């Protein structure tokens, strides 16, 4: 009988494969949407730019005055390129179009570069949050109160115009362009995230450890496609693949055009 394979062990979410979240600074979110942001603006001060282990983009600690009490509200924002300690940020419908300010999509002109975009009104930021990412406002539809946005993947999405976004591009762009050069650097990179490195190929394993393992030379030995309802220990390879192999003919031509 074979062993419990790596994919099954990861799915069980045991202590070995849990994300290393104990040293992270906290969730990076906008302020909770309130009356002040819907109708005017609130002023905040960037008190610190910090590194968050396990995240590529830096974070900004922003202090706001509480709208009703004599106290300060401290928030963690994903930092935009060009933000600095001591900068004043403005969040709300009537805020200016400046890097780091947070406005609803309906108040942002077409062609503007934005980041940390809400997917649903009040969800406090969901799209274009990785280091160097940005989205672009394409068009507004005043009849349906929606805005068309081009995402970092290149896909275009229609969002409610009341969704908020930060002006600018996420800081930390070009982080992945520097080569790791040695295994030790990769080890420390992934140690801050989770246990997902190094990745051993299935064909390099013994047959007891993986369905692709074993043999006098490294080969799968059977079709690598598996059906969707396959048992967990055999569900490896190309799962429920519609097709395999490189595209040929008209399909390849259409795919090449879509890349440009």
UniProtKB/Swiss-Prot annotation:
Residues 227-248 are annotated as: Disordered. The keyword Metal-binding does not apply. Gene3D superfamilies: 2.30.30.30, Nucleic acid-binding proteins, Ribosomal protein L2, domain 3. Keywords: Ribonucleoprotein, Ribosomal protein. Pfam families: Ribosomal_L2, Ribosomal_L2_C. SMART domains: Ribosomal_L2, Ribosomal_L2_C. GO terms for cellular component: cytosol; cytosolic large ribosomal subunit; cytosolic ribosome. GO terms for molecular function: RNA binding; structural constituent of ribosome. One of its GO terms (biological process) is translation. It comes from the Eukaryota. InterPro entries: NA-bd_OB-fold (IPR012340), Rib_uL2_dom2 (IPR014722), Ribosomal_uL2 (IPR002171), Ribosomal_uL2_arc_euk (IPR023672), Ribosomal_uL2_C (IPR022669), Ribosomal_uL2_CS (IPR022671), Ribosomal_uL2_dom3 (IPR014726), Ribosomal_uL2_RNA-bd_dom (IPR022666). HAMAP family: Ribosomal_uL2_A. Belongs to the universal ribosomal protein uL2 family. This is Large ribosomal subunit protein uL2y. It comes from Arabidopsis thaliana. The lineage of its organism: Eukaryota, Viridiplantae, Streptophyta, Embryophyta, Tracheophyta. The gene is RPL8B.
